[in-house]
Amino acid sequence: LITHASQTDDMATRIPDSHGVYMVPAFVGLGAPHWDPDSRGLICGLTLGSTQAHIARAMLESVAYQTYDLIRAMREDGAMRTSILRIDGGMAVNDWFAQFLSSMLKAEVERPVNIETTALGAAFLAGLQVGLWKNLDEVAATWKQERVFAPKMDPAQRRIMIDGWHDAVRRTLTPPAPVAQPTAGVTSIRAA
């Protein structure tokens, strides 16, 4: 479908929507909040009009939907509410994705100047250990914002898309094991 991740931004913006295509990337099952190690990946909603761009966009959308599900689960578990999410890593350079994520979360999404913060975090820990920084406040002061994305999507459209995602996820979940039935030779006890 694509040869490099950088192509996905152009593919996602070339079309107005995913045309009802959803991708559930359950290649090794689903983790939180679904906890189904036996579920399998799924692409659904394909039609004769579906293109590579629709599938690529559905892939990007799936990351935002998974983030939505995780944050919702954290809030239901009593986690502190926040109106800002900071992103990093390779997908963070994709403006379309960052905007979509912001709309799905109904929260601002902040992208740092340096998107490779995983490696930077290891460097910060080493620097703290040798005394380069005195405390975490000094480390936090080094973070620089490159751009902020604010939610833009119509709430009704957002709800339709999230409901479509949850329908797709339900299709991947392993059905519960059947309830064991009494075996031959076992009698039931009846009240007289």
Where are the predicted features?
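Active-site core segments that coordinate phosphate-bearing ligands/cofactors
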Residues: 1-192
